[in-house]
Amino acid sequence: WMRTHEIKMASLSFGGTAEDIKPVIPVGASDTASLDAAIELLVRSGKAMPTAKSMLVPEAWQASPDMPDETRAMYQYMASVMEPWDGPAALAMTDGRWAVAGLDRNALRPLAFNLTDDGLLVVGSESGMVSLEDSQVVEKGRLGPGQMIAIDLEEGQLLRDEELKSRIAREAPYESLVAGFRGIDDLPDPPENAAPSFEGDDLSRRLTAAGMTTEDMELILDAMALDGKEAIGSMGDDTPLAVISDKPRSVSQFFRQNFAQVTNPPIDSLRERHVMSLRTRFANLANILEEDDQNDNVLVLETPILTSSEWARLRAGFGDKVGTIDCTLRAGGEPADLRLAIERIRAEAEAMAKGKQAEIFLTDEATGPNRVGVPMILAAAAVHTHLTRKGLRSFTSINVRSAECLDTHTLAVLVGVGATTVNPYLAEAALVARHERGLYGDMSLEQAVENF
């Protein structure tokens, strides 16, 4: 994502040498090296190091009811400027002016500190890393999720978390900067029947074309609609890996793992709602290095997953900025037709990004007897990667209306390859049909859709 910002990135601090710092993150850099490069960029552009840390590795502010309004506005603004870095990480950094230590929002790495009576601050993964006499220690503790502790070496001050956040929140008029932010409820209502629905034989044919079976409906869709959570089985999963299966498999299945490849601690469902967010945004602010060079026409959504009515509302809200790309190709063609279709989709997206249709909507609704859908993961990834290489991605949004989406994994893969929003319209249509058949008891259709 840093590459998408580089096309608009400018600061008076760099003068005429701004192009010399690009790319900010070298190809092949490790996670640590990438974060180091991003922090150095922000610091050298004039931001204080605690501000850079708060911008890149923020605390979980969305679900913190006791947070001061000015601090919340600061984080809201920063979230609209910069994509957050997740961690897990215990950070220690200095630029000669500041010495800062802090944790990411999950705090899955320990960070303890000791302060002595002669002004020595020791911070590390555990107490006892540096031998200190107990009589010298005047304060000890550990940092919590998203917290910082820092020393202003120039002023000789030790600043704790609340002092730092309050100081950063006063660096710019953040509350006025976010005053113009909008939500989906602020958009105009769409025209009636703006989002077509599918039913009967047409729905059945579309479900078959998308590879969805009755078993999928019963085991996956119904569990999500009734309980608002993924289905859990107890008998294991012996389905062959997609890459060696002799059955047709969706592209998302090639990204599925049956084991925990990364050994970071898991996030339980209770902690997840406090430390994670699904918020997404439109109208990326223009320049990540300058607060006064921003666009206040920012739309923030609570989730990238849209219902069909929300999809229609989004299109109506964007008006003539909408560009629609058909992600289908002729049925019965040659294997090379898929590559040609993806090249066409990329070319159309580039033309829209360079023109006035910056809100790109990819859809496979034209699927039918003579048209088959391009795998939407390939289409979305191709558009995102192509626009990034052309320096156009930060000017656009990529909104996907896909028949392939049924489970959370497919939705997550689409967001992971670059989709701004996703509308699983066919799964929603199937849910409506099953509700009409009385399969969800007394539950309202609105509640079933919300659960899903």
Question: What are the language-model segments listed below?
Answer:
Residues 1-20, 33, 62-90, 96-101, ...:
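Glycine-rich phosphate/ribose-binding loops and adjacent secondary-structure elements
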